[in-house]
Amino acid sequence: MLARTIQRFSVVAKRGYAAAAPAANANPEELRLTFASPDTAVFSNAVVKQVDVPTLAGMVGVLANHVPTIGVLKPGVVSVTTNEGTVQRLFVSSGTLSVNIDGSCQVLAEEVLKVEEIDESAARAELDAAQRASGEGSEVARAEAQIRAEVAEALIKAATNQQ
């Protein structure tokens, strides 16, 4: 009886694994950037020279052949240098960075704003309001106010080219 039970359960379904799909235009000698937010695709698999990204671990400069990396974005300016040498500066509030072995890089941000579109006076007003709120209310409200203040400070730095 035990032999039949063991035999019945010894037929285990073998797990199949899919073969890795080849990446489209994979060339680790190129840096392919996808930079997007939920409502905006700034770059879509575009070949660029360099991307500088603010992360919780510090600024990360990404070039072709970069070691695979993941990171969490902090509020600040992402600088994208195209192959032609032009630099595009965009403010991000938060998000993720992923650098892959195939030469691709994804910057997925919660919010993206062109640096030249930042309203410095509105950012200063938000900073003042957040600082006032940081000493009031529940622990959650104080934490939210601290996050608002951090984003407002980063916006002001970006608007005044302090980054």
Swiss-Prot record:
Q: Which GO terms describe its biological process?
A: proton motive force-driven ATP synthesis
Q: Specify the transit peptide boundaries.
A: 1-18
A GO molecular function term, named singly, is: proton-transporting ATP synthase activity, rotational mechanism
Q: Which GO terms describe its cellular component?
A: mitochondrial inner membrane; mitochondrion; proton-transporting ATP synthase complex
Keywords of the record:
ATP synthesis, CF(1), Hydrogen ion transport, Ion transport, Membrane, Mitochondrion, Mitochondrion inner membrane, Transit peptide, Transport
What's the family? Belongs to the ATPase epsilon chain family.
Among HAMAP family, the record links this protein to: ATP_synth_epsil_bac
Subunit record text: Subunit of the F-type ATPase which has 2 components, CF(1) - the catalytic core - and CF(0) - the membrane proton channel.
Annotated protein name in UniProt: ATP synthase subunit delta, mitochondrial
Q: Which organism is it from?
A: Caenorhabditis elegans
Its taxonomic path starts at: Eukaryota, Metazoa, Ecdysozoa, Nematoda, Chromadorea
